[in-house]
A protein has these predicted regions:
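Short, charge-rich amphipathic alpha-helical segments embedded
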Residues: 4-41, 102-111, 272-273, 343-345, ...
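Solenoid-like repeat scaffolds
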Residues: 13-16, 100-102, 147-149, 179-186, ...
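Amphipathic alpha-helical repeat scaffolds of TPR domains
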Residues: 19-34, 60-82, 105-127, 150-164, ...
Length: 438
């Protein structure tokens, strides 16, 4: 999914052979939408249109399958690009289905068709109650057919993990995850990919290892070709985010904190400012790690953040409120609660954390803070009700990996029930948690 590097490679191929139709096709393809960035900025749309024209111009030199891919890609773009890309993306997926029917023995064609279908519902292949969304069964069937043709096809294994990870049976992709571990050892994102299935199947230590390897690869690549730019920054951050989360779930607090701090430090300030609506929530992650391990003094020692990070500024108050409540400093906790409510109101509605809005995540934090504070004040039932509300809101968040809330609310609710000697209720909460986080 390193589209920038792919474009550079295709451009070099086109420089060496200006009449190579597939080099121009590749540039046009890589400028298009994908599940992690379902947009086409105007400069990318213009370049895609130009390169598509060159691919069509030189298509006579291409094979029949390549000509079919070029013809299908022509359905994906228009000049000028419309405000609503939906009809173009659907037309491209439909065209790729026909190409796959014509060339059912070509695994690349099948993988590109599956991706075109996934792009119609990015990160939304399964409903909250575990039912496949429209098109999901076709995606899975296509990828399984591709893997019968080429079991080690990198893209098909990659997409298969994404296709089933949010399903009720993520273990379907365990074999694909294991194949991915050493399939492309120089590509950090693909080294990391098995952890998407590991953490859904309770293989937490394997998830730690996969992401440790991925982080080592991304650092080695930075030494070879320079620091990452653009969206690649966030792919690298994602590896460390996933590593920290898996470390949290295995009780490795120091390891989690090491990598979450490194993740934050490696995002340049200028990139934070330019991409604040995407990056803001990443910067808040150290608070969740510290809360997980009850490191209250460290939470309270962290400084405030710039105004261009409104979510992190708000989350800081929530974390401080929980820390003060845990230390029995109720008045200070109330002050932070008031500050959190005021700061959360300033978070723009379009700020996001992965597949969720920052405001939706703030709502989980609001109920967590209220629950912890009420519980510490001795209002046990009220506190438990707020924690249960936090659980409900966490469950309603859209699927993402790592989860948008990496401090499982059921763990806090279960601990509170244990302290209240409501052991049967606590046991049920923990059993429910194991369904979500085995």
């Amino acid at each position: 999914f390193n589209h920038g590097a792919a474009i550079s490679a295709f451009k070099e191929a086109a420089r060496l052979d200006p009449e190579c139709a597939m080099a121009h096709w590749g540039i046009a393809l890589a400028n298009g939408p994908h599940i992690n960035f379902p947009f086409v900025p105007p400069p990318a749309a213009e370049e895609a249109w130009h390169e598509l024209g060159l691919a069509q111009k030189y298509a006579e030199h291409a094979s029949r399958a390549e000509q079919a891919l070029i013809d299908a890609l022509a359905k994906r773009y228009a000049n000028p690009q419309p405000d609503d890309r939906g009809p173009l993306d659907r037309a491209y997926a439909d065209a790729m289905r026909e190409v796959w029917k014509r060339f059912p023995k070509d695994p690349d064609v099948g993988a590109f068709f599956a991706e075109a279908m996934m792009d119609l519902r990015p990160w939304n292949q399964w409903s909250h109650d575990g039912k496949p969304e429209p098109g999901t069964d076709e995606i899975i069937g296509t990828l399984e057919a591709v893997l019968k043709l080429d079991l080690n096809h990198p893209f098909a294994n990659h997409l298969y993990i994404h296709a089933v990870e949010a399903s009720p049976h993520p273990e379907r992709a365990l074999a694909a995850a294991d194949r991915m571990r050493d399939l492309q050892p120089g590509i950090a994102h693909n080294v990391h990919m098995p952890s998407h299935i590991d953490i859904r199947c309770g293989r937490w230590f394997e998830a730690v290892t996969a992401n440790e390897k991925a982080v080592a690869v991304q650092h080695r690549n930075a030494e070879l070709v320079g620091p990452p730019q653009g969206i690649l920054l966030f792919y690298n951050a994602h590896n460390q985010h996933m590593l920290a989360y898996a470390a949290m779930m295995t009780g490795q607090g120091d390891l989690a904190m090491k990598h979450i701090k490194s993740m934050v430090a490696e995002i340049p300030e200028e990139s934070l400012k330019q991409l604040a609506m995407f990056a803001d929530a990443f910067i808040a992650m150290p608070y969740e790690v510290l809360l997980r391990f009850g490191r209250w003094d460290e939470v309270l020692a962290l400084p405030d953040h710039p105004e261009y990070l409104p979510f992190t500024r708000a989350f800081r108050h929530a974390a401080r409120g929980i820390a003060f409540a845990a230390r029995g400093e109720v008045e200070s906790a109330h002050a932070e609660q008031e500050a959190f409510v005021a700061a959360a109101a300033l978070v723009p509605p379009d700020d996001i954390m992965g597949n969720n809005t920052a405001r939706d995540i703030d709502e989980v934090a609001r109920h967590m803070l209220a629950g912890e504070l009420l519980y510490r004040e001795g209002r046990i039932d009220d506190g438990l009700a707020e924690l249960r509300a936090a659980v409900k809101l966490e469950d309603a968040l859209h699927y993402d990996e790592p989860p948008p809330w990496i401090l499982p609310t059921r763990h806090s609710l279960g601990a509170a029930l244990m302290q209240a000697r409501r052991y049967a209720e606590a046991e049920q909460v923990y059993r429910d948690d194991l369904v979500h986080l085995p």
